[in-house]
Design a protein with these regions (language model features):
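N-terminal small-residue-enriched
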Residues: 1-235
Length: 235
């Protein structure tokens, strides 16, 4: 088992080669503020890096500014926004039957209907904050004490088609894949590997050097559609 991750990848390699050639002729994007649609991989990186780490209770407990930013019950977005962390889903990179304190893995809702409803805990942080252990105590190996870390974190599937999301955009960007990025509390910047301009509701030319930067809470509040094409990407 496991060879399925490396076998029968000819089409994936072909697409990567074609994209690399296309990028040679792509122009850098013009700086500005745009409506943005992001693909599944970049959405996963965004929610993991920009939001997920702020949901790790050891960081929240030890950081007064984070505690002030992340109170349970705070509204972060519209009702369509739902975010979870789930270590019980089979065959994913973060999957485990139990965390490293023996707490069973399960689905933990972090945002439901746009409202912060939970965070990720070890037994220690749960006791300190009067909440419940979530199965997120992870250790590199037996030499290290467990700390709070995500398992498989995602934005839940939405209802919008891709065509729904782009049809009313006069001028925007469709950003794909993740090349790198950084976060500083609620502020973030991520580079997409490649992107396309959206013009008059249609995908247009490829562009490069696309860096998405902003404030996490402002960005979550501005999400007005979530695609219905959710998929896990083991990358």
């Amino acid at each position: 088992q496991g060879y399925e991750y490396v076998l029968d990848k000819d089409e994936l390699v072909r697409k990567a080669a074609v994209r690399a050639v296309e990028l040679l002729g792509a122009r850098p994007v013009q700086a500005g503020q745009y409506p943005v649609v992001i693909d599944q991989l970049l959405a996963g990186v965004f929610i993991h890096e920009a939001f997920g780490h702020l949901s790790e209770a050891d960081f929240v407990y030890e950081n007064p500014k984070a505690r002030k930013m992340m109170p349970l019950g705070r509204r972060f977005g519209q009702d369509i926004l739902n975010v979870y962390d789930d270590g019980s889903i089979p065959n994913l990179r973060g999957t485990t039957l139990y965390d490293d304190e023996g707490t069973p893995a399960r689905r933990n809702w972090l945002i439901q209907n746009g409202v912060l409803v939970g965070r990720l805990h070890s037994r220690q942080t749960a006791a300190k904050m009067g909440e419940t252990a979530s199965g997120n105590a992870r250790a590199v190996n037996y030499r290290f004490a467990p700390i709070v870390r995500m398992t498989n974190t995602a934005i839940d599937n939405g209802t919008a088609t891709f065509e729904d999301m782009i049809k009313d955009i006069k001028l925007g960007i469709y950003a794909c894949d993740a090349y790198g990025g950084e976060t500083q509390l609620e502020n973030f910047s991520f580079s997409s590997s490649y992107a396309y301009m959206i013009r008059d509701g249609r995908i247009a030319e490829m562009v490069k050097d696309v860096i998405l930067a902003g404030n996490l809470f402002t960005t979550l509040g501005n999400i007005d559609m979530i695609g219905n094409d959710f998929k896990w990407l083991n990358t």
